[in-house]
């Protein structure tokens, strides 16, 4: 089990296709009662270890696409790993199960070494994971504009903010840090890489992690694992300016009612070219509807506490559904601007905000 978990931690960077460069696969070294595992694909490098009975120190580089799946299928209990001197093969044995894999020259593997970064911050793993989950969905998946595929991490004194956008919607979450970081600044990390990081985090209530960064790299240290990633170069949009300072309407809705209304209209929206949904705020109600002559029409209305002018406005239905999937509590608050962005605010979590730009309706 320890061997499987260690291989799983570094798998993301292992480049297990045999046709790639020399650094592909798993670098494994054994000494002083532990086995260290590394993988490096030049965009990320991961290093972890597990305890072991080491009879003789040594290291191997295994370019084995099926190594992890093979180890997973071995019976529970001790696994013996052995490479005989002068041979380019490594053997794994568990009970009556035996496998061997070819090895490559370890001298050409780019080792993952800890970088002495200037800036450091410590925080709870669960807080970091929550922040990533609450904003990453808003990032773009279009590699043509790499800035928007990333998440901005903005650290200013004891306030840590994450923001993600695809230029049509933006999600931002901030927390107050228990420890003051060694410096302030911001950096951009791929949203998919941060998802990889949080999949590896320990889940204990008080488990801590360290984040350290410099001009080109960010490192995440937690438990037995060190995760190093390249940063995305470029200037991120000023997320604070995206949120309007004034609105024409404030609407407080029952979250469950709003979810059901959007869900009811969404089948029509999903079949339309621009996947739009219309909202009409008036007379203490919110009407949600969409129609297309070739598809049909769906509409419903729910009670709403309204403060401001009547507004009719259109949004991308998927973008509205996305924030509702990440919302909690009994109520949700919409701050609406005629022909302008709508800010979605959580009644029970003011530090989590979402803004979405309108679309042209019928």
Model region roles, listed by residue range:
Residues 1-362:
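Structural preference for solvent-exposed beta-strand-turn elements
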């Amino acid at each position: 089990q320890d061997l499987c978990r260690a291989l799983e931690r570094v798998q993301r960077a292992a480049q297990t296709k045999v046709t790639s460069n020399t650094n592909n696969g798993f670098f494994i070294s054994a000494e002083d009662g532990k086995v260290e595992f590394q993988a490096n694909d030049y965009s990320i490098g991961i290093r972890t270890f597990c305890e072991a009975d080491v009879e003789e120190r040594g290291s191997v580089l295994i370019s084995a696409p099926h190594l992890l799946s093979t180890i997973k299928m071995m019976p529970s209990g001790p696994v013996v790993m052995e490479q005989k001197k002068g041979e380019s093969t490594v053997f794994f044995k568990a009970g009556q199960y035996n496998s061997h894999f070819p090895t490559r020259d370890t001298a050409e593997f780019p080792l993952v070494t800890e970088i002495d970064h200037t800036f450091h911050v410590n925080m709870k793993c669960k807080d970091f994971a929550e922040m990533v989950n609450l904003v990453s969905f808003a990032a773009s998946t279009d590699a043509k504009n790499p800035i928007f595929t990333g998440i901005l991490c903005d650290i200013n004194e004891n306030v840590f903010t994450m923001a993600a956008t695809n230029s049509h919607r933006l999600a931002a979450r901030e927390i107050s840090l228990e420890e003051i970081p060694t410096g302030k600044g911001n950096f951009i990390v791929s949203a998919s890489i941060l998802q990889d990081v949080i999949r590896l985090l320990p889940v204990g209530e008080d488990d801590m992690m360290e984040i350290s960064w410099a001009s080109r790299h960010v490192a995440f240290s937690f438990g037995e694992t060190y995760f190093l990633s390249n940063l995305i170069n470029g200037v991120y949009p000023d997320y604070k300016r995206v949120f309007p300072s004034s609105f024409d309407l404030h609407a407080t809705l029952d979250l469950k009612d709003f979810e059901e209304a959007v869900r009811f209209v969404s089948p029509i929206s999903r079949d339309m070219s621009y996947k739009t949904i219309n909202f009409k705020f008036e007379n203490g109600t919110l009407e949600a509807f969409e129609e297309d002559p070739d598809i049909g029409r769906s509409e419903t209305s729910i009670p709403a506490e309204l403060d401001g002018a009547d507004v009719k406005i259109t949004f991308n239905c998927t973008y509205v559904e996305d924030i509702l999937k990440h919302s909690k509590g009994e109520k949700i608050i919409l701050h609406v601007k005629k022909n302008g962005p709508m800010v979605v605010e959580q009644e029970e979590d003011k530090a989590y905000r979402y803004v979405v730009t309108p679309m042209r309706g019928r």
